[in-house]
Amino acid sequence: MNLQTKLINNNMNKTFADIRVGDILYWGAIDMDHVATTIVTDTHLNLDGEHSPKVCDVTFKTNDGFEFDICNCYINIHNCIIFTHEINGNDIYIGTTKEAVAKNILKTLNSRISFWANRKERFIKRYNEED
C-alpha cells in the first residue's frame, strides 16, 4: 500500500494537527489549471493554551517550495479547507484527495459565476427601468 492510499484510507478522523512529514496533500487555487500534489517535509505545531490540544496552528513546508500556515486546525482532513495564502492573497484549497480540492474550487467558481450573472441581471433590469 503506497503512502497516498494509506493516508486516504486509514485516517478518517485525522486532523491537520496529526499531519506528519511524508504525508501527501493536494492543493490548488482558482487561478491554477490543475491540482498540485505535495509531500509534507516539515510541520510545526503552535499549541495555544486557550484551546484544546487538538486545536492548533500548523505550518507545512513542502518539497515544492510552498509554506502553508493553517490556523485553528480542528478539522477532518477529508473536508477540503480554504485559507488565504499570506504571500499572494489568493485562496488556497488544500485536502487529502484531488477530488476534494477540485470540487471545492469548482463550487467556488460556480458561485462566483452565479453571483456575477445575478448582478448583471439586476443591473440590466434597473437600467431598463430608468428609461
Which residues does each predicted region cover?
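Mixed-charge, Lys/Arg-rich low-complexity intrinsically disordered regions
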Residues: 2-20
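Solvent-exposed strand-loop boundary residues in beta-sheet-rich modules
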Residues: 30-31, 64
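Short beta-strand-centered aromatic/proline hotspots
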Residues: 31-49
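Short, solvent-exposed secondary-structure boundary/capping segments
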Residues: 45-59
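Intrinsically disordered, low-complexity, charged/polar segments
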Residues: 57-130
